[in-house]
Design a protein with these regions (language model features):
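Conserved N-terminal phosphate-binding loop of PLP-dependent enzymes in the Aspartate aminotransferase
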Residues: 2-426
Length: 426
């Protein structure tokens, strides 16, 4: 790959580092060399060769306020000056405690106990451990399996992979290695899932689902009735319900949290990605008092034995508090509503193309699903040549822009997709 680096090879750090870096989701022998970035601002990525790209996916769905927002930057700088990090075992700091209180007040339902970690995958691992140990602490060891759903993706660590779709996901190499759980269809009605829970409910600790939008598994949508059915089935069969809002949380679907649209709340929720406005890594797993009370005991073996080294990192918590400030002060959800309209209008021409299976929009998520994409790397390069950064997955081209994107920038993104898909049809 290094001999393909082109202009970037003139930079010593790039040419030398390329011999040692292992990139994500990439076959290193064939993947095009990564683009060297020297600066970000707003929705723009500036490359080392001087080109500027409009980011259509907000750095994997994180930079909801755009890059380099001054309020977040100032909060992080102020925290850096006093305390960048201190371990969270036996010690406490203001940023984490304030953030926990704010999240508890913001979340729907009775989600009030906040456990911090450092990535979305780990937040899911914590949720799975909470759910399993909840039953163990109640003296029930047989409820140790999960119901997850086809098309779902929950992360790349072992437990998270095990509750992701083994066929449509990215972890087929681990078939037969990971723990086996129940992978079901999202219920259009109660019958199939009802039958599964009738037969196996006494072994199921929890169901886990991405509310309204399954992200990395293909950007598939489902409706609020599905979430209501899951809540009702969880209650009927005495299993817990986990909502993975790592992608959908913080306004992406048009409400602060996707589950608000269904009027139901889970027993456990996971958050990350836009939690810090895309500035720093941070995640949280939040549980109801029902869950927390199962761990509240004089018995030390009933404690939740988990502790990421950088959990509740002070810089990440400062960024998250600043991001929540912006949601309170700025019209972010109104901006998402405007983006919804622009995406529907801008992507509509794709519906007329014979190679397009579906065009769908939810909040600040716009999706063009194709019959197939033969060469993802070539397609990504075509977008870069048009001055936009769009990263298709599977057979899907999608947009998840910053909520602060201008109408002209968003039109540039949708025009690039329409032009490219039209060209693919020929």
């Amino acid at each position: 790959m290094a001999d393909q680096a082109g202009k970037n090879s003139a930079m010593p750090w790039y040419a030398e580092g390329l011999e040692h870096i292992w990139l994500p989701y990439a076959q290193m022998k064939t993947v095009p060399p990564p683009l060297a970035v020297v600066r970000t601002q707003g929705t723009r990525i500036t490359l080392a060769d001087g080109r500027e790209l409009i980011d259509g996916i907000a750095s994997w769905w994180t930079a909801c306020h755009g890059y380099n927002h001054p309020h977040i930057g100032q909060a992080v700088e102020a925290q850096l000056a006093s305390m960048p990090h201190v371990m969270f075992g036996g010690l406490a700091h203001e940023q984490a405690f304030v953030l926990a209180r704010r999240l508890a007040k913001l979340l729907p339902g009775d989600l009030t106990r906040v456990y911090f970690s450092d990535s979305g995958s780990v937040a899911v691992e914590v949720a799975l451990k909470m759910a399993t140990q909840y039953w163990i602490n109640h003296g029930i060891r047989g409820k140790n399996r999960f119901v997850a759903f086809k098309g779902g993706y929950h992360g790349d660590t072992t437990g998270a992979m095990a509750v992701s779709d083994p066929d449509a996901g990215m972890h087929a190499a681990f078939a037969g290695v990971l723990p086996r759980h129940h992978i079901a269809d999202l219920p259009d009605d109660d019958s199939a899932l009802d039958h599964l829970l009738t037969q196996r409910g006494d072994t199921v600790a929890a169901m886990i689902v991405e509310p309204l939008v399954q992200g990395a598994g293909g950007m598939t949508f489902h409706n609020v009735r599905t979430l209501r059915r899951l809540r009702a089935l969880a209650d009927r069969y005495d299993v817990l319900l986990i909502f993975d809002e790592i992608f959908t949380g913080f306004g992406r679907t048009g409400t602060m949290f996707a589950c608000e649209q269904a009027g139901v709340a889970p027993d456990i929720i996971t958050l990350s990605k836009a939690l810090t406005g895309g500035a720093l890594p941070l995640a949280a797993t939040i549980a109801t008092p029902r869950i927390f009370d199962a761990f509240w005991s004089d018995d030390p073996t009933k404690a939740l034995m988990h502790g990421p080294t950088y959990m509740a990192n002070a810089l990440g918590c400062a960024a998250a508090n600043a991001s929540l400030d912006l949601f309170e002060r700025e019209p972010r959800l109104r901006q998402v509503a405007d983006i919804t309209i622009a995406l529907e209008r801008g992507l509509a021409p794709c519906r007329d193309f014979s190679n397009v299976k579906d065009v769908r929009v939810k909040g600040a998520i716009g999706v063009v699903e194709l019959d197939r994409i033969d060469d993802l790397d070539s397609l990504r390069t075509q977008f870069i040549e048009q001055g936009v950064f769009i990263r298709p997955i599977g057979n899907v081209i999608y947009l998840t822009p910053a909520f602060t994107i201008s109408s002209d920038e968003l039109k540039t993104l949708t025009d690039a997709i329409v032009k490219t898909v039209r060209k693919m049809k020929q």
